[in-house]
Amino acid sequence: MSGVAGREATLLAFDYGEKRIGVAVGNSLTRSARPLVVLQNRNREYRFEAVGKLIDEWKPDALVVGLPMHPDGTPHERTQLAKRFGNQLNGRFNLPVTWIDERYSSVEAEAGIRSGTRQAGMLDAEAACIILQQYLDGLSLEGPSDDHEFR
């Protein structure tokens, strides 16, 4: 099995929230991510229909989901919701899911919007972009890693 470090893979990342879901797209070869869209999290049917359209359009090799944690690393009240969302993505779309600690991603996105380096109105997508960039930055330059393999 080949890891992403040595090959090109398209990735979609999600910053799951009870009202909105931020989405970003990235590429493992260029190790770059960009904000894509903010989906309204109206209900399960709407949520997965919207995600399905993005998956059909972008044809990702894998998905990344931000995992909310407290600053001390303990699970957040929303941690289980994000885990369930990631498991549902895996079950519905048969794509591998990796969870990334998303501590401070929204804070960083807000700071970027205030400074003008990030897009206003896209806070959740900007947070997803930060989550995905953290994942991409963590890919080993030396070759495949069991932690980041797509099956």
From Swiss-Prot:
Know the name of this protein?
Putative pre-16S rRNA nuclease
Indicate where this protein resides in the cell.
Answer: Cytoplasm
State the UniProt keywords alphabetically: Cytoplasm, Hydrolase, Nuclease, Ribosome biogenesis
* Spans traversing the lipid bilayer: none
Which PANTHER family does the record cross-reference, listed alphabetically? POLYNUCLEOTIDYL TRANSFERASE, RIBONUCLEASE H-LIKE SUPERFAMILY PROTEIN
Give the matching SUPFAM superfamilies. Ribonuclease H-like
GO molecular function per UniProt: nuclease activity
Superkingdom: Bacteria
User: Which cysteines share a disulfide bond?
Assistant: none
Q: Does the keyword Phosphoprotein apply?
A: no
Q: Does Isomerase count among this protein's keywords?
A: no
Function, as annotated, reads: Could be a nuclease involved in processing of the 5'-end of pre-16S rRNA.
Gene Ontology CC, one term? cytosol
As recorded in UniProt, its EC number(s) are 3.1.-.-
> Which processes are annotated in GO (biological process)?
rRNA 5'-end processing
Please name the Pfam families in this protein's record: RuvX (PF03652)
Family indicated by similarity: Belongs to the YqgF nuclease family.
